[in-house]
Regions:
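Active-site capping/gating regions of soluble enzymes
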Residues: 1-64
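Catalytic domains of carbohydrate-active enzymes that cleave complex glycans
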Residues: 53-261
């Protein structure tokens, strides 16, 4: 549901006989509610899918809401995402930097490099910073229930749907953190231990080339680790840190990056 970082949806690989459009979100529902600067042109995986589409991927759509603010978009910098979507919809060969520089020059009516250069850097680095200080390492759905601007991983709305609750996704317990989406030979319905000791099987929905990467803790990209695995707090990351230390340091890195902007 438009989290700061998600793997490409497996439906794009599986629905071979159905024409599809890829939907992205211009409105920053989970990336600072159009208040935080978060420049989000398509990532390289999405660009690859769109540049070399199968016959059933026929277009793209952008989810957006205009508000009652003077600039429609919530904040001055949020407009960059609307502009980037329009540019990439018509020309996928454009680089993120080209779009950022062009938008800054047009929106602020200046070509002064003392402004364009540092603000281009802010735009290009902003998304990774947001991921780091909000939901790093594949963590997801830990936002507040009444709004999606800040975190509320402890949220547990009485009578609410389980799969709308943050705890359903982060699965934090004494052993570890993260949602187990691995495949053990069969797909499982929701039951005790689901998403922790019992994998949902979601990883098997991907082509073998991705399944073989995502399904193992050892090979899963660390930026998606907690999306696909329930990971022990003392699990050693590639840099030798425990998962807990890496999580704390990544949050801190994101905050420091945002402060530097």
């Amino acid at each position: 549901d438009f989290q700061p970082r998600e793997p490409v949806n497996p439906l794009l690989f599986a629905m071979k006989k159905t024409k599809m459009m890829i939907e992205v979100q211009l409105t920053q529902e989970y990336t600072g509610e159009s208040i935080h600067t978060c420049f989000m042109p398509f990532d390289d995986n999405m660009i690859s899918l769109l540049r070399h589409p199968t016959e059933n991927i026929v277009g793209i759509a952008g989810v957006s809401n205009v508000g009652d603010m003077k600039n429609w978009c919530g904040s001055e910098m949020t407009k960059a995402n609307w502009y980037a979507f329009g540019k990439l919809a018509s020309n996928l060969s454009l680089s993120k930097e080209t779009i950022a520089r062009e938008w800054l020059a047009k929106n602020f009516d200046t070509t002064d490099p003392r402004f364009i250069n540092p603000m281009t850097r802010v735009l290009l680095e902003s998304h990774e910073a947001v991921v780091r200080y909000m939901m790093p390492l594949g963590l997801h759905h830990i936002f507040a229930a009444g709004h999606h601007y800040g975190p509320e991983p402890w949220c547990n709305i009485k009578g609410g749907r389980d799969d709308w609750q943050p705890w359903y996704y982060h699965k934090a317990d004494a052993q570890g953190l993260g949602f187990n989406r691995t495949y053990d030979g069969e797909f499982h319905d929701v039951q005790p231990g689901f998403g922790v000791n019992i994998g949902s099987g979601n990883a098997r929905l991907y082509p073998d080339s991705l399944y073989n990467i995502y399904n193992k803790v050892e090979t899963c990209p660390e930026q998606l680790l907690l999306w696909f695995h329930h990971v022990a707090w003392n699990h050693r990351m590639h840099n030798g840190e425990t998962m807990w230390d890496a999580l704390c340091h990544t949050y801190d890195q994101g905050v420091r990056e945002a402060e530097a902007f």
